[in-house]
Curated annotation (Swiss-Prot):
Species per Swiss-Prot/TrEMBL record: Hordeum vulgare (Barley)
Primary localization: cytoplasm
Binding of Zn(2+) 1, residues: C47, T49, H69, C177
Cofactor binding annotation: Binds 2 Zn(2+) ions per subunit.
Enzyme class: oxidoreductase
Residue positions binding NAD(+): T49, G202, L203, G204, A205, V206, G207, D226, K231, T272, F316, R366
UniProt name for this protein: Alcohol dehydrogenase 2
Cofactor: Zn(2+)
Catalytically driven reaction(s): a primary alcohol + NAD(+) = an aldehyde + NADH + H(+); a secondary alcohol + NAD(+) = a ketone + NADH + H(+)
GO biological process per UniProt: formaldehyde catabolic process
Assembly and interaction partners: Homodimer.
Length: 373
């Protein structure tokens, strides 16, 4: 392309400070260096993680910054040493990476790349410690190595998944974060078999993606657990057969589920990050063979392990970004995985702050933001 090797001036939504509306600015995006790729972002979606770091909740503030990490685009140019991608390739940027050389990448069981594992505080490129974005010569920091709230962005090649060019980027862009996280927690970690019972705790986008995985696996009974009764109707689109609101019961929700399933579910996936929900998810699985997935710290009686329950943690659904995500896209292309039902809003890039407002009000699942007006 004519822009290869040159600085590109483009629009980007810049977060200048915590909690303030993003500002549409003209930024300069430098060409990719060794083992880097410059992508033209066509579609990006807003994830709760973007909002969390925009608000700087409990984190080290890194501003000014270009947020965004769930997106789809086309390779504009590549840096020295990049051999797997060429300009024109359709790609998904990913907030974590796969160098294909470290012990984790060589393992069939792990996706925690030593080189490119998620780093929320790093606002620069990993190779030279510099930002590729500037305004009037001053650096604008990156976010999760992706910064997809920009028309063009430079990303390490290990954080870019090449996908089927026939796949619609306005749909599969969702797979670069939340949907794959939930889907893989079910398909790759808890691995329910056809006819099993599955409980999903937390029915946001990640939880519903986990539920979609249970549906795809042929689970005979899928129990959705959430404190918001309005989530029930929406969950039915994802295969939910039963809905339990812990506030409707006087006993712990795990006891309710054990009673309604004659001893417990076969699999449980916890998608809230709440310690109490983790305990409930673990203790509602059947003794002897139950498997529960969790996201963080929790406490339970050691006897629950002696009773042959299994607890598993996972990151990004256990998918390796470069070698695993193309297969998830293929699931969508084969009509096994349904993505349209996750998309509740669509907006032009100029209205990106409206997407933040929608999420802050708890409206919808995913808002897809298109770069073209």
């Amino acid at each position: 392309m004519a822009t290869a090797g040159k600085v590109i001036k483009c629009k980007a939504a810049v977060a200048w400070e915590a909690g303030k509306p993003l500002s549409m600015e003209e930024v300069e995006d430098a060409p990719p260096q060794a083992m880097e790729v410059r992508d033209k972002i066509l579609y990006t979606a807003l994830c709760h993680t973007d909002v969390y770091f925009w608000e700087a909740n409990g984190q080290t503030p890194v501003f000014p910054r270009i947020l965004g990490h769930e997106a789809g685009g086309i390779v504009e140019s590549v840096g020295e040493g990049v051999t797997e991608l060429v300009p024109g390739d359709h790609v998904l940027p990913v907030f974590t990476g796969e160098c294909k050389e470290c012990a984790h990448c060589m393992s069939e069981e792990s996706n925690l790349c030593d080189l490119l594992r998620i780093n929320v505080d790093r606002g620069v490129m990993i190779d030279d410690g510099q930002s590729r974005f500037t305004i009037d010569g001053k650096p604008i920091f990156h976010f999760l190595g992706t910064s997809t709230f920009s028309e063009y962005t430079v990303i390490h090649v290990g954080c870019v998944a090449k996908i089927d060019p026939e796949a619609p980027l306005d749909k599969v862009c969702l797979l670069s974060c939340g949907i794959s996280t939930g889907l893989g927690a079910t398909l790759n970690v808890t691995k329910p078999k056809k006819g099993m019972t599955v409980a999903i705790f937390g029915l946001g986008a990640v939880g519903l993606a986990a539920m979609e995985g249970a549906r795809m696996s042929g689970a005979s009974r899928i129990i959705g657990v959430d404190l918001n009764p309005a989530k029930h109707e929406q969950a039915k689109k994802f295969g939910c057969t039963d809905f339990v609101n812990p506030k409707d019961h006087t006993k712990p929700v795990q006891e309710v589920i054990v009673e309604m399933t004659d001893g417990g579910v076969n699999r449980a996936v916890e998608c809230t990050g709440n310690a109490d929900a983790m305990i409930s998810a673990f203790e509602c699985v059947h003794d002897g063979w139950g498997v529960a997935h969790k996201e963080a710290v929790f406490k339970t009686h050691p006897m629950n392990f002696l009773n042959e329950r299994t607890l598993r943690g996972t990151f990004f659904g256990n998918y390796k970004p470069r070698t695993g995500l193309p297969g998830v896209v293929d699931m969508y292309m084969r009509k096994e995985l349904e993505l349209d039902k996750f998309i509740t809003h669509s907006l032009p890039f100029s209205q990106i702050n409206t997407a933040f407002d929608l999420m802050l009000r708890g409206e919808g699942l995913r808002c897809v933001i298109r770069s073209e007006e």
